[in-house]
């Protein structure tokens, strides 16, 4: 895969430039654009993934299905599709917006900061998974209610962005409705 960049943003969310993805994620990460997606299978189960140990931020942590960064000139929806193919080897239905104004800042145990405007999407898988081990070290298909209960009971076991997304009542309601609509 070619070198990825992040789109830097000002405080109002207006693009101000780009920076190479790995150079962008430091202890002083600038605000940038990202996306987060929750994928469901035909049974309505959520794909929960465990980040590869080689990941710069939050290695080995359980998280929602796939996250990434749109490239310059690429829509968020196209970025979701691209990363699903790259990380999971899977085709998906058109991504649907779940939490369009999600924004967060979090610091992982090594000091790496995520500082993102990060719209959240949901989609369904339409093919079998072909996991990229450089991105994902493990995965599970789970009932959404069980995952949400797990997040509520043990938030430390999941990525901070997944916990924050699940804490939003409107996003939680939309994810539940999406999971039930087969």
From Swiss-Prot:
Keywords: Cytoplasm, Isomerase, Isoprene biosynthesis, Magnesium, Manganese, Metal-binding. GO terms for biological process: dimethylallyl diphosphate biosynthetic process; isoprenoid biosynthetic process. Binds 1 Mg(2+) ion per subunit. The magnesium ion binds only when substrate is bound. It is an enzyme of class 5 (isomerase). Pathway: Isoprenoid biosynthesis; dimethylallyl diphosphate biosynthesis; dimethylallyl diphosphate from isopentenyl diphosphate: step 1/1. Mg(2+) binds at residue 87. It is found in: Cytoplasm. GO terms for molecular function: isopentenyl-diphosphate delta-isomerase activity; metal ion binding. It holds the Pfam family NUDIX. Its cofactor is Mg(2+); Mn(2+). Its EC number is 5.3.3.2. Homodimer. Belongs to the IPP isomerase type 1 family. This is Isopentenyl-diphosphate Delta-isomerase. The gene is idi.
């Amino acid at each position: 895969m070619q070198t990825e960049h992040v789109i830097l943003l000002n405080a109002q969310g207006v693009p101000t430039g780009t920076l190479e993805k790995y150079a962008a994620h430091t202890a002083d990460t600038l605000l940038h654009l990202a996306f987060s997606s929750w994928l469901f299978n035909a049974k309505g189960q959520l794909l929960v993934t465990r980040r590869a140990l080689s990941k710069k931020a939050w290695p080995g942590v359980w998280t929602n299905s796939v996250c990434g960064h749109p490239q310059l000139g690429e829509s968020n929806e196209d970025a979701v599709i691209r990363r699903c193919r790259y990380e999971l080897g899977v085709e998906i239905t058109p991504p649907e917006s779940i939490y369009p104004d999600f924004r967060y800042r979090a610091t992982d145990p090594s000091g790496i900061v995520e500082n993102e405007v990060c719209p959240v999407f949901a989609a369904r898988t339409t093919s079998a998974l072909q996991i990229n081990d450089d991105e994902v070290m493990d995965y599970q298909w789970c009932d959404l209610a069980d995952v949400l209960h797990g997040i509520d009971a043990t938030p430390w076991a999941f990525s901070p962005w997944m916990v924050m997304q699940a804490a939003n009542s409107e996003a939680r309601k939309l994810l539940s409705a999406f999971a039930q609509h087969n």
